[in-house]
């Protein structure tokens, strides 16, 4: 990837949602909700505390994470639809 996030920002690729319901009904693209789960693609170096010391992020590339429905900024990088968000927008890491 030709993009490196700064500070406490991360780049996330959304994981696609289900194509069918449990009952077998196919969900059209227009009715699908945006997935709130994604994979971390790249992370910034971290934020700075009050004394100016660098604080590394708790997440790393490859982590699967949950985030809020309206979190982040949607961007297209190298032909991929991605999100750029602050680490604080991430709700947690999926084990």
From Swiss-Prot:
<protein>
    <recommendedName>
        <fullName>Co-chaperonin GroES</fullName>
    </recommendedName>
</protein>
<dbReference type="GO" id="GO:0051085">
    <property type="term" value="P:chaperone cofactor-dependent protein refolding"/>
</dbReference>
<comment type="similarity">
    <text>Belongs to the GroES chaperonin family.</text>
</comment>
<dbReference type="Pfam" id="PF00166">
    <property type="entry name" value="Cpn10"/>
</dbReference>
<dbReference type="GO" id="GO:0005737">
    <property type="term" value="C:cytoplasm"/>
</dbReference>
<dbReference type="GO" id="GO:0051087">
    <property type="term" value="F:protein-folding chaperone binding"/>
</dbReference>
<dbReference type="InterPro" id="IPR020818">
    <property type="entry name" value="Chaperonin_GroES"/>
</dbReference>
<keyword id="KW-0143">Chaperone</keyword>
<dbReference type="GO" id="GO:0046872">
    <property type="term" value="F:metal ion binding"/>
</dbReference>
<keyword id="KW-0963">Cytoplasm</keyword>
<dbReference type="GO" id="GO:0051082">
    <property type="term" value="F:unfolded protein binding"/>
</dbReference>
<comment type="subunit">
    <text>Heptamer of 7 subunits arranged in a ring. Interacts with the chaperonin GroEL.</text>
</comment>
<dbReference type="GO" id="GO:0005524">
    <property type="term" value="F:ATP binding"/>
</dbReference>
<dbReference type="InterPro" id="IPR018369">
    <property type="entry name" value="Chaprnonin_Cpn10_CS"/>
</dbReference>
<dbReference type="InterPro" id="IPR037124">
    <property type="entry name" value="Chaperonin_GroES_sf"/>
</dbReference>
<dbReference type="GO" id="GO:0044183">
    <property type="term" value="F:protein folding chaperone"/>
</dbReference>
<dbReference type="InterPro" id="IPR011032">
    <property type="entry name" value="GroES-like_sf"/>
</dbReference>
<comment type="function">
    <text>Together with the chaperonin GroEL, plays an essential role in assisting protein folding. The GroEL-GroES system forms a nano-cage that allows encapsulation of the non-native substrate proteins and provides a physical environment optimized to promote and accelerate protein folding. GroES binds to the apical surface of the GroEL ring, thereby capping the opening of the GroEL channel.</text>
</comment>
